[in-house]
Amino acid sequence: MLQPSRRKYRKEQKGRNTGIATRGAKVSFGEFGLKAIGRGRLTARQIESARRAMTRHIKRGGRIWIRIFPDKPISKKPAEVRMGNGKGNPEYWVAEIQPGKVLYEMDGVDETLAREAFRLAAAKLPLETVFVHRQMG
């Protein structure tokens, strides 16, 4: 699963996920892409689960790019622990997603196969997504 190898600080404040994606909003590596039209956060497990679904569907052909990375730690207190006594330990990693962000890209396969692979991947994600083509020019 994806997670940063080194970080300056172990824990991060909650923050707010606002705005729309301006960077990473175009298909730039492959021919087809899966673009988020919803807002939310994807865990490292969800990103990996969607990647596996796509990889299994396209078998040997094609190439997949993951355009997102879970770089935000989410901390959680253990079960049945009283409030206070500091912040909990980092439990898992998430990528914050704004509408318009390209999540995955694919190349080397025909459109019908890519559409089906992205449909299977989208079923694993808690966001609304749309299939997109590369814009020429």
Curated annotation (Swiss-Prot):
Keyword Transmembrane helix: no
Disulfide bonds, paired cysteine numbers: none
Gene: rplP
Name of the protein in its database record: Large ribosomal subunit protein uL16
GO biological process: translation
Record-stated family: Belongs to the universal ribosomal protein uL16 family.
SUPFAM superfamilies, alphabetized: Ribosomal protein L16p/L10e
Cross-referenced PROSITE patterns: RIBOSOMAL_L16_1, RIBOSOMAL_L16_2
Keyword annotations from UniProtKB, A to Z: Ribonucleoprotein, Ribosomal protein, RNA-binding, rRNA-binding, tRNA-binding
Gene3D superfamilies, per database record: Ribosomal protein L10e/L16
Entry-linked HAMAP family: Ribosomal_uL16
InterPro entries linked: Ribosomal_uL16 (IPR047873), Ribosomal_uL16_bact-type (IPR000114), Ribosomal_uL16_CS (IPR020798), Ribosomal_uL16_dom (IPR016180), Ribosomal_uL16_sf (IPR036920)
Name of a matching Pfam family: Ribosomal_L16
CDD domains, A to Z: Ribosomal_L16_L10e (cd01433)
